[in-house]
């Protein structure tokens, strides 16, 4: 049974056993574009990927299922070489405040593509992690500070979004996955915490 057949079964909930780890060649393969109309499997896959992210951010479900928290997942991480990503960034609010929306960014993206980006680069101050990497890799992961991304939803409708800050980093990390790139490829090997002119450090 193929990975997509197993994962899209009605009763299946994606867990850490479904996520392949670094060293698997699928993570180094440029994934194939999906064609529209999508197959039922491709639609269900996107929904299950989003469901996994919601479970991973729910303390009760995460503990019950043994999940690491995640804000993004790409189909290649499930050993499915298709250009499908899911991103789920919670709204961080000050103590005592009530968020307007639970999530700052919530999207299942088919064939996402960066169509323009800022000259300025940015990196998370605490570095990045990955559900497919079971080790800490310290260093600044240098990315674009701002990006414009085109993608299609499950109905084949095209969307264009402009992203900055943390949301921009998350989407770039997932788009890297569909291009066979790992986050640590973007860390300066000789000097992991090198700060070049104009690099924006996001705390």
Curated annotation (Swiss-Prot):
GO molecular function: metal ion binding; peptide deformylase activity
Necessary cofactors: Fe(2+)
Keywords attached to this entry: Hydrolase, Iron, Metal-binding, Protein biosynthesis
Catalytic residues (positions): 174
Enzyme class: hydrolase
Annotated catalysed reactions: N-terminal N-formyl-L-methionyl-[peptide] + H2O = N-terminal L-methionyl-[peptide] + formate
Domain of life: Bacteria
Residues annotated to bind Fe cation: 130, 173, 177
Gene Ontology biological process terms, A to Z: co-translational protein modification; translation
E.C. no: 3.5.1.88
Bound cofactor: record note: Binds 1 Fe(2+) ion.
Function: Removes the formyl group from the N-terminal Met of newly synthesized proteins. Requires at least a dipeptide for an efficient rate of reaction. N-terminal L-methionine is a prerequisite for activity but the enzyme has broad specificity at other positions.
UniProt record similarity statement: Belongs to the polypeptide deformylase family.
Protein's UniProt name: Peptide deformylase
Species of origin: Streptococcus pneumoniae (strain ATCC BAA-255 / R6)
